[in-house]
């Protein structure tokens, strides 16, 4: 009987880990043939930290180059409880890219169609989103973020990898810098 009481006391003292860790698959990078996902950890009843990223290691043809990696740590404050409802966040991002021969939506970086850019970026911003609970483990989350990115790049005359260097430059970008529609699994 004494062993049972000691075991019961020990079990009551253990911290429960239900719904503290989540893994996510961001479906938006998949549209472009990239892998996107991340892991989140609850650090309180209304706070989580996340490490997300995206990777596209290949190109499609000589006239179309689109290789990059992105890493994006984020802090999220949930208005109700973690992994449920609305949240606000602050994030950092870093990336390396080699892209050209591509037309982006809304006329953003319109010169990408004729030229190739190779370089890196660092920045950060603020985000907001919503998390829908489907059941105890599966959820869907959407998020949008705006921020600042410092971009350092080399611009090449055309899309081909053998193209001559046109110039080097820097760009200060302010605008949308995060978008996600994620399938989330809670442990």
Where are the predicted features?
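Sec-dependent N-terminal signal peptides
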Residues: 3-14
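Short strand-turn segments of transmembrane beta-barrel domains in outer membranes
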Residues: 22-30
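Boundary of Sec targeting at the N-terminus
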Residues: 18-19
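Short, surface-exposed coil-to-beta transition loops
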Residues: 33-36, 125
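Gram-negative (and chloroplast) outer-membrane scaffold detector with strong preference
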Residues: 41-142, 180-185
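Short secondary-structure capping/turn segments at boundaries of alpha-helices and beta-strands
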Residues: 24, 36-38, 76
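Predominantly the C-terminal beta-signal and adjacent terminal strand-loop region
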Residues: 135-187
């Amino acid at each position: 009987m004494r062993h049972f009481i000691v075991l019961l006391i020990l079990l009551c003292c253990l911290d429960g880990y239900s719904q503290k860790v989540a893994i996510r698959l961001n479906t938006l990078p998949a549209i472009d043939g990239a892998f996107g996902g991340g892991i989140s950890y609850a650090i309180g009843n209304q706070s989580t930290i996340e490490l997300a990223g995206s990777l596209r290691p290949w190109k499609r043809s000589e006239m179309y180059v689109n290789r990059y990696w992105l890493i994006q740590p984020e802090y999220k404050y949930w208005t109700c409880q973690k992994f449920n409802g609305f949240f606000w966040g602050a994030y950092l991002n870093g990336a390396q890219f080699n892209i050209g021969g591509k037309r982006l939506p809304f006329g953003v970086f319109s010169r990408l169609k004729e030229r190739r850019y190779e370089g890196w970026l660092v920045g950060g911003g603020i985000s907001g989103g919503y998390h829908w609970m489907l059941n105890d483990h599966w959820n869907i989350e959407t998020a949008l973020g705006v921020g600042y990115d410092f971009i350092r790049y080399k611009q090449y005359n055309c899309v081909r990898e053998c193209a001559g260097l046109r110039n080097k430059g820097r760009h200060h970008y302010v605008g949308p810098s995060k978008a996600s529609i994620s399938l989330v699994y809670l442990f």
